[in-house]
Regions:
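Short, cationic-aromatic polyanion-contact patches
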Residues: 1-7, 20, 53-74
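Amphipathic alpha-helical dimerization/coiled-coil segments
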Residues: 73-105
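Key DNA-contact positions within bacterial/archaeal DNA-binding proteins
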Residues: 33
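Alpha-helical residues within the helix-turn-helix
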Residues: 26, 44
Length: 105
């Protein structure tokens, strides 16, 4: 689930307050069942909390809110992603320089 965690935390951070599981599932391309499973896992890890809408006619309606832990996790995952991409870029730059050096000889 670690690969999906960043995707989910990012989507939940940007989701409208009234987004339900079906809406989130459609937006991310997952089944509603998998969406429910992942949301429960994120709640269990403390990255997310589900709050009932007080003024909602639908008493089963929840909004999903990132916790401070969830936001920290999202930041750490984003930093790791950026670092990984920098390393890939630098490796490509070195490879390009090697190819240029071989070609110019």
């Amino acid at each position: 689930m670690n690969d999906d965690t960043e995707t989910w935390l990012k989507a939940l951070q940007k989701a409208p307050l009234a987004a339900n599981q079906r809406t989130l599932a459609k937006k991310l391309g997952f089944s509603v069942g998998k969406t429910n499973y992942i949301l429960k896992a994120l709640i269990a890890k403390g990255h997310l909390k589900a709050e009932r809408f007080i003024n909602s006619n639908n008493k089963r309606a929840y909004r999903y809110v990132l916790t401070p832990s969830g936001l920290q996790t999202r930041i750490k995952l984003a930093e790791k992603f950026i670092q990984r991409k920098k390393e890939e870029y630098e490796a490509l730059q070195r490879e390009l320089e090697e190819l240029k050096a071989k070609h110019s000889q």
